[in-house]
Amino acid sequence: MKLHTSKRWYLHLVYYKLLRFTRFFTNRFLGKKDHKFLFILSPPYCGSTLLNQILSTSGNLSCNNHLGVREGQLLPEVKDIMFNNKGWHSEVHYPWIKIKKIWMKYWDQRKLILMDKTNTNIIRVTEIKKVFDNIYFLGMVRNPYAQVEGIIRRNNSTPEYAAQFALNCLRYQKKNKEFEVNSLFITYEELCDNKGNVADKIKAFIPELGDIDSDLEFSAHNFKTDGKMKIQNLNDEKIKKLSTNQLALINSYFNKEVELLNYFGYSIIN
């Protein structure tokens, strides 16, 4: 299966090849042992790319993919295994030992903390834990109305599909929050509106992270600009983009799951 045919993708392939080449020597001769593995558990369109960029300001952390939306599942050797292989189907099982071996070639093993952000991992925590030791999970959710708007706009999805998808994500995250001991959960709203407090929570959760800088301008993709911007809560603007008809269709599903929304601090919007 062809991954891409664009010029940009071929440039990315050159970058990845050069990165693996340099990592081979630095990891082989200077790499640390006993790494800590940090997995961002976040549904799509919930601010996970922004969170990834913030955490990547730490001098003690390495992200396995610095391009695009920064997801480990999009690296060339694993894209067909993960991204193109029914990522949201829980009955599909990935070869995690092989995936880890590939990711280790991209991580800077001179860093103590090795981080991945792959959205579909919210449904694969149990499998991940079987392969990775010293593991930490940093979970995040976002107002589901804002997430639904992103799914509709970016994926050209129907409100019905987007609403059901968002609810399924919340169900998975509720399970992860309740059953994963070594985990910390935050919300997109907390990250944007009280970033200093969230940064302190994260550093208390994994002290080896050291200092992180949330005051920079970040290039996480959003509907306002493809350029860099300061952290800003975009929920209100996104939710206002939903039409009255779309909102009614969304609420036909959300009204049946009020308790689930309330669990994460969200409520019905009419």
Question: What is each model feature region?
Answer:
Residues 109-212, 231:
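PAPS-dependent sulfotransferase catalytic domain
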Residues 57, 61, 134, 208-209, ...:
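Short, well-ordered coil loops that connect the C-terminus of an alpha-helix to the N-terminus
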Residues 1-99:
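PAPS-dependent sulfotransferase catalytic core
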Residues 101-105:
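Conserved alpha-helical scaffold flanking the Walker A/P-loop in AAA+ ATPase domains
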Residues 72-74, 194, 219-222:
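Short secondary-structure boundary/hinge segments and terminal tails
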Residues 1-37, 206-270:
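PAPS-dependent sulfotransferases, especially Golgi type II membrane carbohydrate sulfotransferases
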Residues 77-83, 87-94, 117, 122-128, ...:
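Anion-recognition interface
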Residues 66-72, 140-145, 215-217:
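A short, structured active-site edge motif that brings together acidic residues
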